[in-house]
Amino acid sequence: MSAKGEYAIKAVLDLATHRARGLIPLQEIAARQGIPQRYLEQVLLALKRAGFLASKRGSAGGYHLTREPDEITVGAVLRAVEGTSAPLEPLGQGRRAHGDGHDLAGLWEEISEAVSQVVDRLTFGDLLVRAAERQSRVRPMYHI
């Protein structure tokens, strides 16, 4: 997965987490997620073109999801920004390994298919539930 794919996942998850607030400014998403604003603009534009986001300009502007988090899969978001048919496209796909001459294309195809199956069934609603469960397991430590 590229940085663009990772940033897209972070941005959509951030918007899903804060969706009750309505429009979320790009600067807030960038600051919370540690994403350069110029790069985030490109990612959000791709997600907007794909129909996952809507935006409003101006001082009270920002971005919001156009669908519920349960209706957006991680795979769909990755494809929107990566522009590929698979979320995992290995470098050198189809090349032969050095030394023994085994064709690794079949292995990469299986790995890519397995990753696709996971991200195509995993929604941002699922990620929100996981984050909430992880937060509930974190207990404060009091040191005296």
Per-range role (PLM):
Residues 94-144:
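C-terminal regulatory/oligomerization modules of transcriptional regulators
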